[in-house]
């Protein structure tokens, strides 16, 4: 009788241990990475200053999409500017440091098709909080044209 009591529990243990062998995983194998606080739409103002010109301000929207495999620290960003001198829509890249949580330093850079018929470059560095981004904004529009460099600021609030 003693042998039978040992064999039955051992058989059940072996059956349970091998039940999943040879099968593909059907669910998540690790924790979900979640969403970044930056994901979504941010709206606000873009102020641009150019040599010999007064500062001017226009509306701007940035939409952040997290790049997979970057610990929620790198993003594709679509910028839609309604600024009179820089009416552009472009997709650039952003990164945040030192972690993926606010407050964070944010750096954004990329190229855009200038309304003046060339390729411009932009750079923005600043601070990202849970609901606001405040950063400088600079670049070179058409380097062959006068007053092609610009500086300024972008101030954004999370809207979606």
Set out the residue ranges of the language-model regions.
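Bacterial N-terminal signal peptides that target proteins for export
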Residues: 1-10
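Bacterial N-terminal signal peptides
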Residues: 9-17
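N-terminal helix-cap/turn-to-beta initiation motif at the start of protein domains
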Residues: 26-43, 67-68, 158-159
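Short, aromatic- and cysteine-enriched interfacial helices/patches
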Residues: 29, 37, 85-87, 116-117, ...
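N-terminal leader/targeting helix
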Residues: 38-60
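Beta-sheet ligand-binding and adhesion/scaffold domains
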Residues: 44-48, 71, 97-160
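N-terminal glycine/threonine-rich, aromatic-flanked beta-hairpin/loop signature
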Residues: 53-99
